[in-house]
């Protein structure tokens, strides 16, 4: 079902409540990476260029105690957003009450206002992350229309995305998707529902348990599923390959056997690994084919695996990649991840979609991000979408 998009709305003179994902790393008031702020700009610009009043909501981190508020205020985000928009952004250090209501009522057409971290509401009974209906209704009462542009939280049912949407729709008002959400639905949705073949999925990361739903779902859709990263060794154990001291989920070995039986030749595993005796960037390492000796642990895929994966990918028309091939945060064991990223940048005829923090960091580090079709902004959300799950934040948007 096609969803209502921000460009379908008449926003002129209207108070547009917009859920953005400004959950960015901040240390001592300094933003480490502003990608998520930049990603929201097209939708914000559409609203203000069409004389709407943009009232922005976002969470930042997790608030567990009163002291967390100081570190997790969105004030630095408002300052960065003002620089990016090249216009003032009103920051309201409150999530409800007269201060917020007055600030909204004093807005002119084309103004931008950022509400304080929505999770400040979690201190008193998890009202935001528990989707408290009264909070959703209250926030909805502050505006005329709602735009959800936060794909990063689309898999969560919170007051600031699902709560506002539902309350708006109950009052006969519209809830639309922003451009970022639309893009995610388009690329991730098409990749899973109507991909061009050959379709190859690359799944990395430490745990089979994190990716099990995705592997199972994609085995039914993809022509090949490449597995790398720490979860490889649970599959090795299931195949009877010795894994030394490598990471393994013993309680998932039977599951790995079932997946391999179901997959047949669709599942592609590494054939060699970069191994070391300790989990340390400076540990001496060697490339090992087949069985991993006792006392050694695999920390990255080896050169023959890179060749095998490139051979599997070279004719692909659709590629989805989520998760690293090794211990990406250690530079000596990042090569496998970087090689896969570099190769994806050469696939000019394919739709290439990357999600997950380490995979995204790899393509940005390599400078190939602009050669890929789409970089997903949602970690958990993109994984759940790839599992074929309905995401509450998307479901709550009005249909066209």
From Swiss-Prot:
Keywords from the named record: ATP-binding, Cytoplasm, Glycolysis, Kinase, Nucleotide-binding, Transferase
Residue numbers binding ATP: 211, 329, 356-359
InterPro entries: Phosphoglycerate_kinase, Phosphoglycerate_kinase_CS, Phosphoglycerate_kinase_N, Phosphoglycerate_kinase_sf
A single cellular component GO annotation: cytosol
Gene3D superfamilies for the chain: Phosphoglycerate kinase, N-terminal domain
Pathway linked to the protein: Carbohydrate degradation; glycolysis; pyruvate from D-glyceraldehyde 3-phosphate: step 2/5
One GO MF term: ADP binding
Compartment list: Cytoplasm
Subunit structure: Monomer.
Similarity comment: family membership: Belongs to the phosphoglycerate kinase family.
Entries under HAMAP family matching the protein: Phosphoglyc_kinase
Record protein name field: Phosphoglycerate kinase
Native organism: Ligilactobacillus salivarius (strain UCC118) (Lactobacillus salivarius)
Lineage: Bacteria, Bacillati, Bacillota, Bacilli, Lactobacillales
Gene name tied to this protein: pgk
